[in-house]
Regions:
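Short proline/glycine- and polar residue-rich coil/turn motifs
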Residues: 66-72, 83, 111-114
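Short Pro-Gly-centered beta-turn/loop motif in secreted/extracellular proteins
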Residues: 79-87
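Cleavable N-terminal signal peptides of Sec/SRP-targeted secreted and luminal proteins
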Residues: 5-20
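Universal eukaryotic N-terminal targeting presequences
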Residues: 1-2
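C2-type phospholipid-binding modules
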Residues: 19-30, 36-42, 90, 94-137
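Short strand-edge motifs at loop-to-beta-strand transitions and within beta-strands
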Residues: 74-78, 116-118
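Calcium-regulated, polybasic anionic-phospholipid
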Residues: 29-70
Length: 137
């Protein structure tokens, strides 16, 4: 009886280890079609929005700054290689103000395989973006 319990315990442990290893497989992620609606600038000015983009601990960089845009559409596309499933994709929205940039808000989503469209409500506007993620086998 003890031998059977030990065997079942080892089987469960091995199964959990395999499931965990499956989640550690990385793959590429692409972030595109990034746009916003009704962004409100600092005080009464139109914003000069730009993005900072991360996936997990990998910082990809920032987008172009779009001058005086309340409804920006960024032409930028961000590509990351070898990202682990369930990593967090982070987009920060900033207003480029001369001498002092203003953080307008942050969008986060936990990535999953497939192609997804996301909506992120900020205090002063809404951000829309798409991402696709494919885990390597």
């Amino acid at each position: 009886m003890a031998s059977l319990s030990l065997s079942l315990g080892l089987l469960v442990l091995c199964t959990l280890a395999l499931v965990h290893l499956h989640d550690l497989h990385g793959g590429p992620i692409r972030v595109w079609d990034i746009r916003a609606a009704n962004l409100k600038g600092w005080l009464f000015s139109k914003p000069n929005p730009y993005l900072k983009v991360w996936c997990g601990s990998s910082f990809h960089g920032k987008s172009n700054t779009l001058k005086r845009q309340e409804n920006p559409i960024w032409p930028d596309e961000f590509n990351f290689a070898n990202i682990i499933n369930n990593s967090v994709l982070t987009l920060e929205v900033w207003d480029d103000i001369i001498g002092l940039d203003h953080h307008m808000g942050t969008c986060t989503t936990t990535i999953h395989p497939g192609t997804h469209s996301e909506t992120c409500q900020l205090k002063r506007g809404t951000v829309y973006y798409s991402y696709s993620y494919q885990m390597e086998q």
